[in-house]
C-alpha cells in the first residue's frame, strides 16, 4: 500500500489513533493499526478504525463524512514512543 508503507500493527493500549508514523530509509512514513480497533471519532473511543481512518461506530468505510481525525501530522507534539524506527 503506497499510502501506508509502514507495516500494519496492533494499536497500543491507551492509543485512540488509527495510524502511526515509522521511519523508513531516513524518511517518516505512515502506517495503520489493525481494522476494528477503537478510536476517537467525536468523543472517547466512539469510533472504529478501518484502513487507517477513524469512522463513527456503525458507519462503513465508504462513508464520505469521515472526519479523518485519526492521522497525526509529523510536526504535532507527541512523545518518542509514538514513533517507530526501521
Curated annotation (Swiss-Prot):
Cellular component, GO annotation: extracellular region
GO molecular function: toxin activity
Compartments it resides in: Secreted
S-S pairs: 6-22, 18-49, 39-54
Positions of the UniProt region annotated as Disordered: 58-86
Keywords: Blood coagulation cascade inhibiting toxin, Complement system impairing toxin, Disulfide bond, Hemostasis impairing toxin, Secreted, Toxin
Segments of skewed composition (Acidic residues): 76-86
Compositionally biased region (Polar residues): 59-70
Coiled coil spans: none
Function recorded in the entry: Inhibits lectin and classical pathways of complement system activation in the host with no significant effect on the alternative pathway. Inhibits host extrinsic blood coagulation pathway but not the intrinsic cascade. Binds to neutral and negatively charged membranes in vitro; binding is reduced upon pre-incubation with Ca(2+).
Protein name: BaSO(4)-adsorbing protein 1
Organism for this UniProt entry: Ornithodoros savignyi
Taxonomic path: Eukaryota, Metazoa, Ecdysozoa, Arthropoda, Chelicerata
Amino acid at each position: 500500500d503506497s499510502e501506508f508503507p509502514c507495516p500494519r500493527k496492533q494499536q497500543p493500549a491507551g492509543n485512540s489513533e488509527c495510524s502511526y508514523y515509522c521511519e523508513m530509509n531516513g524518511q517518516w512514513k505512515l502506517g495503520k493499526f489493525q481494522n476494528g480497533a477503537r478510536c476517537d471519532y467525536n468523543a472517547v473511543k466512539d469510533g472504529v478504525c478501518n484502513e487507517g481512518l477513524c469512522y463513527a461506530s456503525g458507519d462503513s468505510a465508504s462513508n464520505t463524512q469521515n472526519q479523518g481525525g485519526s492521522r497525526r501530522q509529523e510536526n504535532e507534539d507527541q512523545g518518542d514512543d509514538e514513533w517507530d524506527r526501521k
